[in-house]
C-alpha cells in the first residue's frame, strides 16, 4: 500500500493527465504542402481518399496497388486536385522484392521521402477458421511482413527528413473478433512490431515518428461487401477517416482511433498499457545496443 501511494498512484495520475489532456499542435493542411509521401493500397477505398486529400494539400505523392489502370486514374485526379507531383508504381505486396524496390523507385521519383503511409491488405472474407494455413501465411506476409520490408527500405530516407511512418491497422488488431482470425493476427502483429520499434527509436534518438491508426468499420466498397448480411453496425465515412489518418501522421501522434462509435474510442484507449510499458522500460539497459 505504501508503494502504491508513493510511486504507482502519482505515476498513474501523470499518465492519465497526459493521455487525456495533453494538447497536440493543431493540424494545418499546409503541413503537407511540398511533402513527399508514399501511399500503399491507393487504388480504392481509404488509400485513394488519402491520396486525394494529400493532393489537395499540395503534396508530392507516389501511390501503389496492383491495378495499373486504376492507379493511372488516381494519379490523373491527384494532379487535377493540385498535387505538387503524382506518380504510380503498380505491383503486388506479396512480392517482397517488389516492396523493397518500390520504395527506392518512389524516393527517386520524389527526391526523398517525408511520410510512408502503409495501408494495403490482402483480400479477406469473413469466415470461421478451420485449417486454411495458406490464408494465414498470406495474410501475415502481405498485411504484416511487407510493412516491415517497406519500413526498412524507407528508413534511411525518413531519417534524413525526420519523417513519419503511418500504419493503418484495425480494431481487430486490438480486440478479438470472430471470423477474421488471420486478418486479426496480422493486425495484432503490426501493433506489437511498430509499438516496439517506436520505443527503440525514442531511446536511440531516431527522429522518425510512428502513428498506428486503429480503425473501426469504414464504408469502403470492399468492407461493405465483406460484412453484408453478417455484421450489423454503422460504418464511418472513408473520406473523413482518410483525413484523420493524415492528420495523425502530420501531428506525429502515437495512435489514431477512428470509428463511428465514441464508446469504442473511449474503451479501447488503454492508459494502463502505457504505464506498464514505462515501468518495464526502466528495467532495460540499452546503452550497449545504442552505442555500437
Swiss-Prot record:
The residues listed in the UniProt record as binding substrate, with positions renumbered to this chain, are 170
Pathway, according to UniProt? Steroid metabolism
Q: Where does NADP(+) bind?
A: 41-67, 92-93, 119-121, 183-187, 218-222
Name the Gene Ontology molecular function terms of this record.
11-beta-hydroxysteroid dehydrogenase (NADP+) activity; 7-beta-hydroxysteroid dehydrogenase (NADP+) activity; cortisol dehydrogenase (NAD+) activity; NADP binding; protein homodimerization activity; steroid binding
> What Enzyme Commission number(s) apply to this enzyme?
1.1.1.146, 1.1.1.201
The entry summarizes how activity is regulated as: Hexose-6-phosphate dehydrogenase (H6PD) provides cosubstrate NADPH, and the glucose-6-phosphate transporter in the ER-membrane supplies the substrate for H6PDH, their activities stimulate the reduction of cortisone and abolish the oxidation of cortisol.
Q: Per the UniProt record, which residue ranges are transmembrane?
A: 8-24
Entry's Gene Ontology BP terms: lung development; steroid catabolic process
Quaternary data:
Homodimer.
Entries under PANTHER family matching the protein: 11-BETA-HYDROXYSTEROID DEHYDROGENASE 1, HYDROXYSTEROID (11-BETA) DEHYDROGENASE 1-LIKE B-RELATED
Protein name, entry field: 11-beta-hydroxysteroid dehydrogenase 1
The species this protein belongs to is Homo sapiens (Human)
Give the encoding gene's name.
Answer: HSD11B1
Amino acid at each position: 500500500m505504501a508503494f502504491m501511494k508513493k510511486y504507482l498512484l502519482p505515476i498513474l495520475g501523470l499518465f492519465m493527465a497526459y493521455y487525456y489532456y495533453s494538447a497536440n499542435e493543431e493540424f494545418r493542411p499546409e503541413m503537407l504542402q511540398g511533402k513527399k509521401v508514399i501511399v500503399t493500397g491507393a487504388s480504392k477505398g481509404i488509400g485513394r481518399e488519402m491520396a486525394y486529400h494529400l493532393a489537395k494539400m499540395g503534396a508530392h505523392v507516389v501511390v501503389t496497388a496492383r491495378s495499373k489502370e486504376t492507379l493511372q486514374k488516381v494519379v490523373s485526379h491527384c494532379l487535377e486536385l493540385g498535387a505538387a507531383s503524382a506518380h504510380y508504381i503498380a505491383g503486388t505486396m506479396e512480392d517482397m522484392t517488389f516492396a523493397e524496390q518500390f520504395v527506392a523507385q518512389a524516393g527517386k521519383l520524389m527526391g526523398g521521402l517525408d511520410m510512408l503511409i502503409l495501408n494495403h491488405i490482402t483480400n479477406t472474407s469473413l469466415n470461421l477458421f478451420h485449417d486454411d494455413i495458406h490464408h494465414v501465411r498470406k495474410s501475415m506476409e502481405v498485411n504484416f511482413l511487407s510493412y516491415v520490408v517497406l519500413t526498412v527500405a524507407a528508413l534511411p530516407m525518413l531519417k534524413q527528413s525526420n519523417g513519419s511512418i503511418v500504419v493503418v491497422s484495425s480494431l481487430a488488431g486490438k480486440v478479438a473478433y470472430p471470423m477474421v482470425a488471420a486478418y486479426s493476427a496480422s493486425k495484432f502483429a503490426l501493433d506489437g512490431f511498430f509499438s516496439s520499434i517506436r520505443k527503440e527509436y525514442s531511446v536511440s534518438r531516431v527522429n522518425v515518428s510512428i502513428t498506428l491508426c486503429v480503425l473501426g468499420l469504414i464504408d469502403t466498397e470492399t468492407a461493405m461487401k465483406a460484412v453484408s448480411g453478417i455484421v450489423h453496425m454503422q460504418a464511418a465515412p472513408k473520406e473523413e477517416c482518410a483525413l484523420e489518418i493524415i492528420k495523425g501522421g502530420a501531428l506525429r501522434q502515437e495512435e489514431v482511433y477512428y470509428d463511428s462509435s465514441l464508446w469504442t474510442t473511449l474503451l479501447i484507449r488503454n492508459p494502463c498499457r502505457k504505464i506498464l510499458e514505462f515501468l518495464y522500460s526502466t528495467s532495460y539497459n540499452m546503452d550497449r545496443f545504442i552505442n555500437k
